[in-house]
Curated annotation (Swiss-Prot):
Belongs to the 'phage' integrase family. XerC subfamily. It comes from Haemophilus ducreyi (strain 35000HP / ATCC 700724). This is Tyrosine recombinase XerC. Keywords: Cell cycle, Cell division, Chromosome partition, Cytoplasm, DNA integration, DNA recombination, DNA-binding. InterPro entries: CB (IPR044068), DNA_brk_join_enz (IPR011010), Integrase-like_cat_sf (IPR013762), Integrase_catalytic (IPR002104), Integrase_recombinase_N (IPR010998), Integrase_SAM-like_N (IPR004107), Recomb_XerC (IPR011931), Tyrosine_recombinase_XerC/XerD (IPR023009). GO terms for biological process: cell division; chromosome segregation; DNA transposition. It holds the Pfam family Phage_int_SAM_1. Site-specific tyrosine recombinase, which acts by catalyzing the cutting and rejoining of the recombining DNA molecules. The XerC-XerD complex is essential to convert dimers of the bacterial chromosome into monomers to permit their segregation at cell division. It also contributes to the segregational stability of plasmids. PANTHER family: PHAGE INTEGRASE-RELATED, TYROSINE RECOMBINASE XERC. Residues 6-92 form the Core-binding (CB) domain. Transmembrane segments: none annotated.
Length: 304
């Protein structure tokens, strides 16, 4: 690997501040962009291209071809193209280059492999567990909330206490692109969250993060993944339990029971459906009605 102190990579230093401050990308996204642009700059330096102004569409295609030869899959090559496109958009904006050479170049198609969902009966066995240890109470609350409301891992990880409305059984989420949405919380998840909030002070909280590690700080993405993996192993789950499997199961179970596809899609926070939502606006009351009628662990309303 070439030293990071190469001319091409050094030119991107101000770009990292732009992404972090103006675009407010997550640390994970920033690290990915840095890793990709470093790999690209090393590839160009090795080809004796030492100025971004020398990169045209043919060079971009060469980068993608070389990436394939290095063993990168379609998804990774697609990410590399996205990084290039965004980087050159920044350079155009700063008047360093006149055109974006990555525009119009298509990424390789990625075969979509959705994780297998856990059926509703097995999900019940996974979550209907008596817990006493504070860490287990926390982990159960995380899983109930993810399955109850279809959260992404990043959405769960960044939750603060103020994002929860336990009276109205709602949670405010900040999704991809900093897009906010409000989703309902099912009764089982609500009970699990209340149990967690009872023992949360024993973790000596250092901030307002909803889910804490043993030092009182916010749980990391990796810690959440490991906690769920260990939970699945303890409950005898045949396949690895990871956060997205809970989100996928949430979507699958709702779609199996509901005839309103758009409601489920809005609950998931899929930005790609914005065009459809122009024609059919779904308010929260409607989403909550679909949720209550469809989710196997919802039943938020008490029967008098």
């Amino acid at each position: 690997m070439l030293n990071k102190q190469n001319k091409l990579y050094l030119q991107a230093q101000a770009y990292w501040d732009f992404l972090r401050i103006e675009k407010q990308v997550s640390p994970h996204t920033l690290t990915n962009y840095q890793r990709q642009l470093l790999a690209i700059s090393e590839m160009l330096i090795a080809a004796q291209i030492d100025d971004w102004q020398a990169v045209d569409a043919s060079v971009v295609r060469w980068i993608l071809t070389q990436s394939h030869k290095q063993g990168l899959g379609a998804k990774s090559i697609g990410l590399r193209l996205v990084v290039l496109r965004q980087w050159f958009a920044y350079l155009v904006q700063r008047h360093y280059v006149k055109v974006n050479p990555a525009v119009g170049i298509k990424a390789p198609k990625v075969a979509r492999h959705l994780p297998k969902n856990i059926d509703a009966e097995r999900m019940g066995q996974l979550l209907d567990v008596e817990v006493d240890e504070p860490a287990d109470i926390r982990d159960l609350a995380m899983m109930e909330l993810m399955y109850s409301s279809g959260l992404r891992l990043a959405e769960l990880q960044r939750l603060d206490l103020g994002d929860m409305d336990l009276i109205d059984a709602e949670v405010r989420l900040l999704g991809k692109g900093n897009k906010e949405r409000i989703v309902p919380i099912g009764s089982r998840a609500l009970t699990a969250l209340q149990a967690w909030l009872t023992v949360r002070p024993s973790f000596n909280p250092q901030d307002n993060a909803l889910f804490l590690n043993k030092r009182g700080g916010r749980l990391s993405h990796r810690s959440i993944q490991l906690a769920m993996q260990k939970w699945g192993e303890r409950q005898g789950l045949a396949t690895r339990l990871h956060p997205h499997k809970l989100r996928h199961s949430f979507a699958t179970h709702l779609l199996e029971a509901s005839t309103d596809l758009r409601a489920v899609q809005e609950l998931l926070g899929h930005s790609s459906l914005s065009t459809t939502q122009i024609y059919t606006h779904l308010d929260f009351q409607h989403l909550a009605k679909i949720y209550d009628a469809s989710h196997p662990r919802a039943r938020r309303k008490r029967e008098d």
